[in-house]
Curated annotation (Swiss-Prot):
Designated name of the protein: NADH-quinone oxidoreductase subunit D 2
UniProt keyword list: Cell inner membrane, Cell membrane, Membrane, NAD, Quinone, Translocase, Transport
GO molecular function: NAD binding; NADH:ubiquinone reductase (non-electrogenic) activity; quinone binding
Record's catalysed reaction(s): a quinone + NADH + 5 H(+)(in) = a quinol + NAD(+) + 4 H(+)(out)
Coarse class of the protein's main subcellular location: membrane
Keyword NAD in annotation: yes
Alphabetical list of SUPFAM superfamilies matching this protein: HydB/Nqo4-like
GO cellular component, one term: plasma membrane
Role: NDH-1 shuttles electrons from NADH, via FMN and iron-sulfur (Fe-S) centers, to quinones in the respiratory chain. The immediate electron acceptor for the enzyme in this species is believed to be a menaquinone. Couples the redox reaction to proton translocation (for every two electrons transferred, four hydrogen ions are translocated across the cytoplasmic membrane), and thus conserves the redox energy in a proton gradient.
One Pfam assignment: Complex1_49kDa
Disulphide linkage map: none
Length: 399
């Protein structure tokens, strides 16, 4: 028999030795399209991901957006500057304090308002409390996406303490409308600082336990380690920020690298993975960054409580303008939200009390654009882990 005898166009007999004959057939495979969402628990909102697959391997991933589009930027052209704050609340509804913080900094920059020092500390305290609450949702829901139920219960148990604190100062558990242009809606209640310090002391060991639950659970590590790799250069070129960028080993945090408010006075470390428990740039790295950031936020809250000026006659509305009508001009201000850089570009024509243009720079939208890069070549089951590691909020993506 010849060494290679062609029987059909796709079937061959190959003699590899005196006794061995191997039948080979080239299988013709077809790509299949798998739709994840828009009603899918792992997408954490109305997101549809179209997966082009070869068997169980993803060849291409395409995110379809717009299911939660509410015309925020167009509405902002017909609402006065203070009235936009409730709209901003509803973008990333898990981190409303940070949304309001960034927006109010932009308007105050446009107006040239100087904020009282106590208010600056109050804003940072509530923003960092909200950051911890947001990260607890991210970590807890991510764990349950991958089948780990216990961390989910731990995270939401401790998040209740934070929501109770935030409810105490503004009456709402979500969509706070607490940070105003030029100030805040209310001063802290009596003994609020003491309650915050009690929470910090209680939660420090809980945060360490949460970190161990993530790094010492073999199944969780196997589902996230070396999955959805995002190289640092790709993340930088795409404009990624927050835990997405820091998870790829890039030490970039606006609170340190483009500081605002009183962040330059605070001592904290930029959270990046060390590469021991995870592979730099994978799903596990991004989630470890969030766990580490919780510790750093606790440090900042402690410092703010110690450094904040005490004034029994403090007026939280002292710098709040009665009428916001800025001169013609434009401004861009940004802040470090839990999911990355949240910026507002505002144009005033100087003619009225509404902005000519209010553009929001969404960290979630930019980070989600990297999904095709991370999902390519991965299994369908791992796409769940990848989407969860991005930690998107569709209210901010679609706006």
């Amino acid at each position: 028999m010849a060494d290679d005898v062609q029987l059909e166009s796709s079937v061959r007999f190959t003699q590899t030795g005196p006794q061995t004959i191997v039948l080979e057939k080239d299988l013709d495979t077809e790509y299949m399209i798998v739709n994840m969402g828009p009603q899918h628990p792992s997408t954490h909102g109305v997101l549809r991901v179209e997966l082009l697959t070869d068997g169980e391997v993803v060849v291409k991933a395409t995110a379809h957006l717009g299911y939660l589009h509410r015309c925020f930027e167009k509405h902002a052209e017909y609402v006065d500057y203070p009235g936009i704050v409730p709209y901003v609340d509803r973008m990333d509804y898990l981190a409303s304090m940070n949304n309001d913080f960034a927006y109010c900094v932009a308007v105050e920059k446009l107006l040239g308002i100087e904020i009282p020092r106590r208010i600056e500390f109050m804003r940072v305290i509530v923003a960092e409390l909200n950051r911890i609450a947001s990260h607890l949702v991210a970590i807890g829901t991510y764990a349950i996406d991958l089948g780990a139920f216990t961390p989910f219960l731990f995270c939401f148990r401790d998040r209740e303490h934070l929501l109770n604190l935030l409810e105490w100062i503004c009456g709402a558990r979500m969509l706070y409308n607490y940070i105003w242009v030029g100030g805040v809606s209310h001063d802290f209640p009596a003994k609020f600082e003491e309650r915050v310090m009690e929470f910090v002391r209680y939660f420090k060991p809980q945060a360490r336990e949460l970190y161990q639950l993530l790094t010492e659970n073999e199944i969780f590590v196997q589902r996230t380690k070396d999955i959805g790799l995002l190289p640092a250069d790709v993340a930088i070129n795409a404009g990624a920020s927050g835990p997405m960028l820091r998870g790829s080993g890039v030490k970039w945090d606006l609170r340190r690298d483009d500081p605002y408010s009183i962040y330059p006075e605070l001592e904290f470390d930029v959270a990046v993975p060390d590469g021991k428990a995870s592979v730099i740039g994978d799903c596990l790295s991004r989630h470890l960054v969030r766990a580490i950031e919780i510790d750093e936020s606790l440090k900042m809250i402690e410092q703010c409580i110690d450094m904040m000026p005490k004034d029994p006659n403090f007026d939280p509305h002292a710098a709040v303008p009665k009428r916001v009508k800025p001169k013609a001009g434009e401004v861009y201000a940004r802040g470090e939200a839990p999911r990355g850089e949240l910026g507002f570009y505002i144009i005033s024509d100087g003619k009225g009390t509404t902005p000519f243009r209010c553009k929001a720079r969404s960290s979630c939208f930019v980070n989600l654009s990297l999904l095709p890069e991370m999902a390519k070549g991965q299994y369908i089951a791992d796409v769940v882990a990848i989407i969860g590691s991005v930690d998107i909020v569709l209210g901010e993506v679609d706006r």
